[in-house]
């Protein structure tokens, strides 16, 4: 299973979001802990910025409860980092997760793994509730049908070899792994995600995540 933690956190500001602390644990540690707790997860591979491999390996191992953790260097783009992680895995299916989604639950991970069985892959996603517009040159150019739109999350589970085959076909920089499989004409199943499975992108997201965690503790 691949946890991608190689980004530059450019929208987060001067601090690093992966080692930011939310309710007593770092963002990356919470992501790792969820995969450790999920059934059906084998080796966990953390993909880190080349300058931070040892640092993030240590963070991940502290959360791994004795499970095997491998840390590898990522690349300049997301797809390069994902490829490094996928190549470090040996399982038939690989779950790919953004390290900056610390509120993922073991249950969602297990649903995605189960959903991928017999298919090229499965992604977590939630229906879009806002009205979405396509904008070109500062003006609205199209009005997509909201009933057809889902916001993709992670984890995204893919057939390892299919992902590698698709990566070899083009040097594009897809922003998710369902798009990568689409190069081969393969379909991904959609597993309903979790509205609480937010991605930490800006400092305000840490406050939202902390509030969600406090709510979980209250039950």
PLM feature spans:
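Residue-level signal for inorganic ion chemistry
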Residues: 3, 28, 85, 97-98, ...
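Conserved core of the sugar-phosphate nucleotidyltransferase
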Residues: 42, 103-191
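Hydrophobic helical membrane-anchoring modules
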Residues: 197-219
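Active-site nucleotide-sugar/metal-binding loop of Leloir-type enzymes
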Residues: 80-93
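N-terminal glycine-rich phosphate-binding loop and ensuing alpha1 helix
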Residues: 1-53
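Short beta-strand-to-loop acidic/aromatic patch adjacent to the donor-nucleotide binding site
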Residues: 91-101
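Conserved donor nucleotide-binding strand/loop of the catalytic core
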Residues: 64-76
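Acidic helix N-cap motif at the loop->helix transition within catalytic regions
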Residues: 54-60
């Amino acid at each position: 299973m691949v946890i991608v933690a190689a980004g530059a956190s450019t929208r987060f500001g001067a601090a690093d979001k992966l080692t930011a602390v939310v309710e007593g644990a770092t963002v990356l540690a919470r992501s790792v802990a969820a995969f450790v707790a999920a059934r059906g997860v084998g080796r966990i591979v953390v993909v880190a910025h080349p300058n931070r491999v040892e640092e993030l390996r240590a963070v991940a191992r502290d959360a791994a409860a004795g499970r095997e953790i491998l840390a590898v260097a990522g690349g300049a783009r997301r797809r390069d980092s994902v490829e490094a992680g996928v190549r470090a895995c040996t399982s038939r299916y690989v779950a790919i997760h953004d390290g900056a989604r610390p509120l993922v639950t073991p249950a969602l991970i297990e649903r995605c793994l189960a959903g991928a069985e017999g298919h090229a892959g499965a992604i977590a996603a939630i229906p879009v509730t806002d009205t979405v517009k396509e904008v070109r040159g500062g003006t609205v150019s199209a009005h997509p049908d909201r009933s057809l739109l889902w916001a993709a999350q992670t984890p995204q589970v893919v057939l390892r070899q299919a992902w590698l085959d698709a990566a070899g076909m083009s040097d594009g920089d897809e922003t998710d792994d369902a798009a990568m499989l689409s190069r081969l004409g393969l379909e991904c199943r959609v597993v309903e995600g979790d509205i609480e499975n937010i991605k930490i992108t800006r400092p305000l997201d840490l406050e939202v995540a902390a509030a969600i965690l406090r709510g979980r503790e209250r039950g």
